[in-house]
A protein has these predicted regions:
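Active-site beta->alpha N-cap acidic-glycine motif
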Residues: 1-32
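C-terminal active-site subregion of NodB/CE4 polysaccharide deacetylases
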Residues: 30, 40-43, 47-142
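Non-cysteine beta-strand/loop elements that form the S-adenosyl-L-methionine
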Residues: 35-37
């Protein structure tokens, strides 16, 4: 019954708010968007066994490849949770980089499998974003 309610709710969403299907993603890859992996089930990766971690990091990449025809190059850690073991799985799976939720900027010598990010709110105005993008809001590295 809950599954039926979820399907009905999904159909009632405006098309722009529905998850993209494989055909839509395939049509956009390469031109408008890059596709990365965020795991198979969005679990906190450091808490998983090696077998579970394999599915979340490695198998999910292969599944996405089969669905949309590209090998994703970037992995975003669910909840930003990672540790050296998780980082090693992401590296050995063939990703070019791993993205954390650690706030900040990155420099050339930084570890590509634990990159920091800058969170931009969806509510930011165009003018505020443009000011931020040209450096009018200073960022400090701690």
């Amino acid at each position: 019954m809950l599954a039926d309610d979820k399907l009905r709710a999904r159909r009632e969403l405006p098309a722009a708010y529905r998850p993209a299907d494989s055909a839509t993603i395939r049509a956009r890859v390469g031109g408008q968007i890059d596709v990365g992996v965020h795991s198979a089930t969005h679990r906190s990766l450091p808490t998983l066994t090696d077998e579970e971690l394999e599915r979340e990091v490695v198998t999910s990449r292969a599944m996405l490849h089969r669905a949309v025809g590209i090998w994703p190059e970037f992995f975003a850690y669910p909840y930003g949770h990672w540790d050296p073991r998780v980082r090693a799985f992401v590296l050995s799976a063939g990703y070019r980089a791993g993205l954390t939720l650690d706030a900040g900027l990155n420099d050339a010598p930084d570890d590509l499998w634990c990159l920091r990010r800058v969170n931009i709110s969806a509510a930011i105005s165009d003018a505020a974003f443009q000011a931020w993008a040209v450096g009018l809001q200073g960022w400090r590295r701690d």
